[in-house]
A protein has these predicted regions:
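Non-catalytic interface/targeting segments
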Residues: 1-60, 64, 71, 97-125
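Mid-chain, well-packed structural core segment of small domains
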Residues: 60-98
Length: 125
């Protein structure tokens, strides 16, 4: 399974998850094996404008990061908060959006494997 998690750092499985997808400096793409163990972790730039856009240029840049994420082909995105535009874009691409318990990538993967997930709803500020 390919699981995307927004993070505050690039410290492998011990990377701390970012509380908000749109403000995360990094995105960790975690590949798990059939038993749910972490097989690999790859990090990508996650900085993108927040979903509350002031101009068409900002909206275009947001679509760009959404396209980059979609191109990574994650099966699931695990986040605590995500704006309505991102929820709409990723859901339309068939990506499952959930929140899970845990502070680090490894803790979140354990929660996903244990089924301790909930459907992610759009965050509105």
């Amino acid at each position: 399974m390919r699981i995307l998690i927004p993070t505050l750092s690039r410290n492998g499985a011990e990377s701390v998850a970012s509380p908000h997808f749109g403000r995360a400096p990094y995105l960790a793409l975690v590949e798990t094996d059939l038993k749910g163990n972490i097989a690999s972790i790859e990090f990508f730039a996650g900085e993108g404008p927040h979903e509350d856009h002031r101009s068409e240029k900002d909206a275009t840049e947001a679509r760009s990061i959404h396209s980059r994420v979609t191109d990574l082909k994650p099966d699931v995105i695990v986040a605590s908060m995500m704006g309505p535009r991102a929820v709409s874009d990723f859901s339309a691409s068939g990506i499952k959006l959930v929140s899970a318990q845990g502070r680090t990538v490894s803790e979140i993967i354990s929660s996903v494997n244990s089924g301790l997930i909930t459907k992610l709803e759009p965050h509105r500020e």
